[in-house]
């Protein structure tokens, strides 16, 4: 869980920008999107092999 404390004399937009940056660095949002729906292990393996095949080319 990312936590951002609004500093003294800091605008809300700046604090929101810092929060978004920290969330993207930790990969929290990507992880949540990945786990939003259950994915069978066979589908995970298939996606993993397809990604490896794409990287190879």
Swiss-Prot record:
Domain of life of the source: Bacteria
Family: Belongs to the bacterial ribosomal protein bS21 family.
GO molecular function: structural constituent of ribosome
Name of a matching Pfam family: Ribosomal_S21
Keyword field contains Membrane: no
Keyword Ribosomal protein: yes
Gene Ontology cellular component annotations, sorted alphabetically: ribonucleoprotein complex; ribosome
Gene responsible for this protein: rpsU
Protein name: Small ribosomal subunit protein bS21
Keywords: Ribonucleoprotein, Ribosomal protein
Organism: Bacillus subtilis (strain 168)
């Amino acid at each position: 869980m990312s936590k951002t404390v609004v500093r003294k004399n800091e605008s809300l937009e700046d604090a929101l920008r810092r929060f978004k940056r920290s969330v993207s660095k930790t990969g929290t949002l990507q992880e949540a999107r990945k786990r939003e729906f259950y994915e069978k292990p066979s589908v995970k393996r298939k996606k993993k092999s397809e990604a490896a095949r794409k990287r190879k080319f």
